[in-house]
């Protein structure tokens, strides 16, 4: 059924919940996992930040992304699965575009990612990478919502 499962990871608790669900799917289907972290350099790439200052910030973002991927891979290995990892950089400002692109290049048949469930003005101001992936993807997308404060951990 799902043989190639792309998991978008960002280091958040919601992302970890998404990874846990992806592991369950992979175990039940015999699927393989690709962990993807997107470094969005547009966050700080402006005309107001001189290169001398931005270069160390970009490097810190890359290092943080590599750590996030390594931690996620450790979770996968503890579940007796293997995975591939990919750190992707974008200047487009659209993380969703990169996630969908990576899914296409790897020929994923499922994308799994966490969603923070923003509503109202926060959603309008910040947008939603998860919603954009859902709109752009030609393969099924499994969105895992953040755990509400009153909900017990599974």
Residue spans of the language-model regions?
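Short, flexible loop segments at boundaries between secondary-structure elements
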Residues: 141-151
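Small/aliphatic-rich secondary-structure junction motif
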Residues: 3-52, 75, 79-86
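Short, structured coil segments at secondary-structure junctions
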Residues: 129, 137-138
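Acidic, proline/glycine-rich short linear motifs
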Residues: 38-67, 150-154
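Glycine-rich, Arg-bearing micro-motifs that act as flexible, cationic patches
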Residues: 110-132, 150-153
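Short, hinge-like loop/turn segments at secondary-structure boundaries
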Residues: 51-54, 102-104, 129-130
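Structural beta-alpha unit
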Residues: 74-111, 151-154
């Amino acid at each position: 059924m799902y043989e190639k499962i792309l998991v978008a990871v960002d280091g958040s608790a919601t992302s970890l919940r998404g990874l846990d669900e992806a592991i369950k799917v992979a175990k039940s289907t015999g699927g393989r996992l690709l962990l993807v972290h997107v470094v969005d350099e547009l966050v700080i790439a402006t005309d107001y930040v001189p290169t001398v200052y931005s270069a160390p910030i970009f490097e810190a973002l890359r290092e943080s992304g590599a750590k996030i991927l390594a931690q996620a891979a450790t979770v996968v290995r503890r579940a007796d699965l293997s995975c591939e990892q990919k750190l992707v950089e974008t200047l487009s400002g659209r993380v969703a575009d990169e996630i969908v692109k990576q899914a296409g290049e790897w020929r994923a048949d499922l994308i799994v990612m966490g969603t923070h469930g923003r509503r109202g003005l926060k959603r309008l101001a910040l947008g939603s990478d998860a919603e954009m992936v859902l709109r752009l993807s030609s393969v099924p997308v499994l969105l895992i919502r953040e755990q509400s404060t009153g909900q017990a951990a599974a």
